[in-house]
Amino acid sequence: MPDLTRAAWRRCRPPLPLAVLSLALLQAHSASAQDAGADAPLTLKRTPQLVETIPQAQRGQLPSFVDGDRISGRPDLETVVEGNASLRRGEIVIHADRLEYYQPDDLAKARGNVRINQAGNVYEGPELELKLETFEGFFNNVRYRFLATGGGGDAERIDFVDSNVSVARRATYTTCRREDYPGWMPAWLLSAATLTTDTEENVGVATDARLSFMGVSTPPFPSLSFPLGNDRKSGFLPPTIGIDSVNGVDITAPYYWNIAPNRDATFYPNVMSKRGLNLGTEFRYLEETYSGEARIDYMPTDTLRNRERWGIWTHHQQAFDAKSYGLDSLGATINFNRVSDDDYWRDFTRTPSLTQRLLSNDAALNWSKGDWSGAVRTLSYQTLQYAPSPILPPYDRLPQITANYNKYDWHGFDFSLNTDYTRFRGDPVQQRQPNGERAFALASLSRPFLTPGTFVIPKVQLHTTSYQFEAPLANGASSASRTVPTFSLDSGMIFERDANFFGRAFRQTLEPRAFYVYTPYRDQSLLPNYDSASNDFNFATVYTENAFSGNDRISDSNLLTLGVTTRLIDPESGAEAARFGIAQRLRFSDQRVTLPNTTAVTDRLSDVLLGAQINWTPKWSVDTTLQYNPDDQKSTRTAISARYNPGSYRNISAAYRYQANSTPMAADGNKSIDVSWQWPLNDLWGDKGQDLGPGKGQGGGRWYAVGRLNYSLQDRKLTDGVLGFEYDGCCWIGRVVLERISTGQVTAATRIMFQLEFVGFAAIGSSPKRTLTQNIQRYQPLRQPVAAPSRFTNYD
């Protein structure tokens, strides 16, 4: 009979007499029977959708279900279940050898092999008393495990305050998975006099706590908090410790302040043994219409430089109510970057936003309405000079106002109008030209003729520019203007065929292209150059009208660009497996418009541009670009890169770059090799591990090699380098990484980063994760925050 009763309940058949008795004894918490006549047909009652958290108001209305070998008791008073006893209500399930439920007090008592599953959190022990609705009670000699972190431990006693808060006495905690053999001890263990956990706030607080790792314990902490999930919480973060060749021993003790769900701040008191104390603060905010972040570092006295040091980095983004202004969109951005001195970028290379030598400060207001768009912007720079390699500061733009109009397919025509007014400010002596104002307009009209296999696009452009100068030019003029027309004709064809290479079927294309451009010569030698530079010679610029970027130089052109591209496309997925291209310019007349201190372009044939991109399988990728000079019969620029990525946590990338010197008399050009990798060393002895999912590694006991080397073949020296190892101990990860960064032609900074991460708990040391992510292509952290698992993944 007992087995039949349990089977009947599991098959959800009409209740047997024993089950009816149990429901009667739990009448206050039972489901109501249908009020229907005896002859009414049976119907299925809808089951509410499964929810992660049951609202508090519904907990007292939920039915209770019991199961066991023997059930006895008195109606409306108590129920006693013996043998394989279980009690289920909502997200609470209790299993025990003997279970007593007292209905007036809503109190459950369990004895013998007791197990509670409360929303996925599991508690096991010999004795329990618990009020079901409020989840108040105690559990003696308990073993527990939390769903969110997978962490757990043992306790002499746990007092349940409510469904979220519990207090464990003489407790331990670890995220190490318990092994089933005598004498097992976790790799790391937190022991505490009391351990208070709050699963709603996802935080644990331990008092009189010790942390042990591999049998070595720390001194006791009066109080220690740790996360029970990925949610943010205020408190001290684990300290970071590093060794730097310039700064010495580097210790940071950050404090995180969770101000609100949409605001937080982190304080970084940082002590460098060779420099002194640095105070850092980072603030972030997120609102419905605006967001931003700011970082401020302040060092009262730098012992090495014997002066005050500081750095500021801010970013703000704002969206306005565009409709009230009659616009489609209206937004603003503000970026502010400033440091105390020119040496800041070399001395503090760990602050990525402030390690550039050109620090931009700009504010912009952007708008759009229909075919119109525009912006009002101010832009200025702080230029950090370095005596061995000085740089010419760019002009500040105070202000820059742009307006653009784009109309597509207007009776078959495409029309655009781009306008720009800029007031340029700089040092006239250093720049060797006067400050001034420039008004620029570019009108463009094209008529595309398109078919599935061909395109022909004739286009005319008109460039107009007007200048006003604060000081006269070399010819005495205080103003100047320029008008330049341009005609271009872009054309191409696309052929397709079925092909087979190396036993694999493809759809192959052949795409010849011809691009002609004519721009008459206009003397621009006396005009200042505020923002123009030569375009890089690549596949993105070879089919463009102007040889220069910016608006101060419009190249005279009478040239034809010829090229052809072929692609191999997988017919099933549509993925591009390979692409090959070649292009060359044929110049019919000299290009006489040049930048200052450069000569006219007289070559009738340009260098040949060749490119290839191969993605034959998802594991392999090769990308090559070659600029070949047919007159000298040698390459003037080469870039070859390859990547091998056969699976998770396995990635090798290599690149070779060559750039010929601009002067023929100079020695060999600039050559460099760049290699990066992440690879499990266990592969060397045949241990391939297992894929546990994104951000979970490949199992414990595995070593990983990580690194990047950027080596200059010309200078025969390492430019930048990262070398390190990671060890995944399943519930802990160890990292040691050596980083070298060049801060000048003959100077470099080196630091060693050690980190010990207790998975799901805390990390000690200096984290190299940002360094590895920035330097290694497709680097995968061994652990990443993931969404908390559903309580139904651990459902009883």
Predicted regions and their residues:
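N-terminal acidic, proline/glycine-rich, low-complexity intrinsically disordered segments
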Residues: 1-5, 31-35
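Short, intrinsically disordered, low-complexity terminal/loop segments
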Residues: 1-3, 73, 792-796
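Outer-membrane beta-barrel proteins and related beta-barrel translocases across Gram-negative bacteria
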Residues: 121-140, 144-167, 171-190, 196-796
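Extracellular and secretory-pathway beta-repeat/beta-biased strand scaffolds
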Residues: 4, 37-43, 242, 252, ...
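An N-terminal domain-start capping segment
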Residues: 28, 116, 240-241
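Bacterial N-terminal signal peptides
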Residues: 15-27
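N-terminal amphipathic/hydrophobic interface segments
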Residues: 33-170, 189-208, 267, 420
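Bacterial N-terminal signal peptides that target proteins for export
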Residues: 2-18
